[in-house]
């Protein structure tokens, strides 16, 4: 698991072409590039599905949501899992629940 000052993340490519990204802590403009850089090589291999586990994410700013939307243009099936209530409301208010397939 990689770590910055306030964020930890893990990137795992599954044999079924599913890319699993787990993010915890605080994801914002100060550390978004570390996550984007770590995931980029796996996205180049064209995964069929991307699952982003955010159950332990305490904070995400608009740069996080922008990154996830950018990933959604590259991967046909993307899901945010274990989305905290506040983040769920933000994603819904932006009209992105279909694009990001938010799940509990």
Feature annotation, model-predicted:
Residues 2-37, 56:
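STAS-typified acidic loop motif
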Residues 26-100:
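Amphipathic alpha-helical interaction surfaces in cytosolic regulatory modules
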Residues 104:
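Short loop/edge segments at beta-strand edges and connector loops
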